[in-house]
């Protein structure tokens, strides 16, 4: 099993290019199932989760060709309505094929998902939404069985905004008869990116980026050629790295309009931030100031940046309070950070972080995707050597992370048995 070894204490400087957003690419690739031709996507990151969705689409009958960051999906031959456990178990986002299959084939049999250790992440929202659009739903032997000769428009309301739920039901509603309204919809940029793609395909969707989305169903959708938006979480990870190491990093192929919650908080820590079009420069301050953070749905501070920001606060001056409101069990990384000398106390969904003079390198184990990134960041600022195991989590969501850090001056390497 691969490990990453980091020698800490180096100031990071230079330029890094941000990859395409995994969380935008996954639903957009799944939306290919709604067309009867070849879609072309550029700026697609080369990640384990992307490979998983490509394997699943191939199993369903799609033909996929890849060249660099370009992926072509020919969905004209899709005729298989079953997504089996051996494929779905690799990644929770595999549930994104459920609604496109029902919309296109009239039925779907999709294994209940796996792939992430963060809380329960229920799919109830997806199923209730499909039922509201006329689908028959049954849970049998670990599978979701959904069928509807033709989906019809319905009224859907989320008790809590669900990104994947919103995306799945958008794809169902795009080909449904009549009008569908989604209330308390997720507003994340990845949702808006999917809507942009669906509308380019010929869908009629309004309200993306707001809590109220209206979809007027159309008879069919056409193939498109589109580029995947930049990854705002990867961007945030490098911004934190600059502040953490008191470095000077220029980040290209970014989308600052997606980063307000992160940019505001980072500026409060004392980092100097310059934004010029799609380029962000972050210069770390002499002192890292402690700030409080509460994770919230977009445009609030993203839960996917909580672990990385906690590392920054672990070496800040003073006490910071980090409140996690999106997922339960998202402080799994704390025990590993404490092994490195971080002073963190957990109470329910709140972490109290007392800034320490320094962190110390130690053997640590990654528990999920963003926890993996936080441990790499901790290793960059720690005294001595940090050895991170179970880094396969990292490969699910970061493209060539250690190589990018190495080009910025970090002493970091991957060790393969």
Swiss-Prot record:
* Pathway stated in the Swiss-Prot or TrEMBL entry: Cell wall biogenesis; peptidoglycan biosynthesis
**Signal peptide range:** none
Name the Enzyme Commission number(s) assigned to this protein: 2.5.1.7
Q: Which organism is it from?
A: Desulfosudis oleivorans (strain DSM 6200 / JCM 39069 / Hxd3) (Desulfococcus oleovorans)
Q: Which protein family is named in the record?
A: Belongs to the EPSP synthase family. MurA subfamily.
Q: What is this protein called?
A: UDP-N-acetylglucosamine 1-carboxyvinyltransferase
GO cellular component terms listed in the entry, alphabetical order: cytoplasm
List, alphabetically, the SUPFAM superfamilies matched. Answer: EPT/RTPC-like (SSF55205)
Q: Which positions in this protein are listed as binding phosphoenolpyruvate?
A: 22-23
State the compartments where it is located.
Cytoplasm
Q: Where is the active site?
A: 116 (proton donor)
Please give the residue positions where the record annotates the modification 2-(S-cysteinyl)pyruvic acid O-phosphothioketal: 116
Q: PANTHER family from the entry?
A: UDP-N-ACETYLGLUCOSAMINE 1-CARBOXYVINYLTRANSFERASE (PTHR43783:SF1)
Q: What does this protein do?
A: Cell wall formation. Adds enolpyruvyl to UDP-N-acetylglucosamine.
* GO terms of biological process kind: cell division; cell wall organization; peptidoglycan biosynthetic process; regulation of cell shape; UDP-N-acetylgalactosamine biosynthetic process
Record flagged with keyword Metal-binding: no
Q: Gene of origin? A: murA
What is the taxonomic lineage of the source species?
A: Bacteria, Pseudomonadati, Thermodesulfobacteriota, Desulfobacteria, Desulfobacterales
């Amino acid at each position: 099993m691969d490990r990453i070894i980091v020698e800490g204490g180096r100031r990071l400087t230079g330029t890094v290019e941000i990859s395409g957003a995994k969380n935008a690419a996954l639903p957009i690739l799944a939306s290919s199932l709604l067309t009867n031709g070849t879609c072309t996507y550029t700026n697609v990151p080369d990640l384990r989760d992307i490979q998983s969705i490509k394997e699943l689409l191939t199993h369903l009958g799609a033909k996929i060709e890849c060249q660099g960051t370009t992926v072509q999906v020919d969905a004209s031959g899709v005729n298989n309505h079953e997504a089996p456990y051996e494929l779905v178990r690799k990644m929770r986002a595999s549930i994104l094929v459920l609604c496109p299959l029902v919309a296109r084939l009239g039925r779907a049999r999709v294994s209940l998902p796996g792939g992430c250790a963060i809380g329960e992440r229920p799919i109830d929202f997806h199923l209730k939404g499909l039922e509201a659009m006329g689908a028959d739903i049954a849970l049998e032997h670990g599978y979701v069985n959904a069928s509807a000769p033709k989906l019809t428009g319905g009224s859907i309301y989320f008790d809590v905004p669900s990104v994947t739920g919103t995306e799945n039901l958008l794809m169902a509603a795009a080909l449904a008869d009549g009008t569908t309204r989604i209330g308390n919809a997720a507003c994340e940029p990845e949702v808006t990116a999917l809507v942009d793609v669906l509308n380019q395909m010929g869908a009629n969707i309004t309200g993306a980026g707001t809590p109220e989305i209206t979809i007027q169903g159309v008879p069919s959708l056409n193939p498109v050629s589109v580029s995947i938006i930049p990854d705002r979480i990867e961007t945030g990870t490098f911004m934190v790295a600059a502040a953490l190491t008191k470095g000077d990093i220029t980040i290209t192929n970014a989308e600052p309009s997606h980063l307000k919650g992160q940019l505001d908080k980072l500026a409060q820590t004392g980092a100097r931030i310059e934004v010029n079009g799609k380029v962000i420069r972050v210069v770390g301050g002499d002192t890292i100031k402690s700030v409080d953070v509460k994770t919230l749905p977009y445009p609030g501070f993203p839960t996917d940046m909580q672990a990385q920001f906690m590392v920054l606060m672990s070496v800040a001056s003073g006490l910071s309070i980090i409140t996690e409101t999106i997922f339960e069990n998202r402080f799994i990384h704390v025990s590993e950070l404490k092994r490195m000398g971080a002073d963190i106390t957990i109470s329910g969904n709140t972490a109290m972080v007392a800034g320490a003079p320094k962190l110390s390198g130690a053997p640590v184990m990654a528990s999920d995707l963003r926890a993996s990134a936080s441990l790499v960041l901790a290793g960059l600022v720690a005294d001595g050597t940090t050895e991170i195991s179970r880094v396969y989590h990292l490969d699910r969501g970061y493209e060539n992370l250690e190589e990018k850090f190495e080009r910025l001056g970090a002493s970091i390497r991957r060790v393969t048995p």
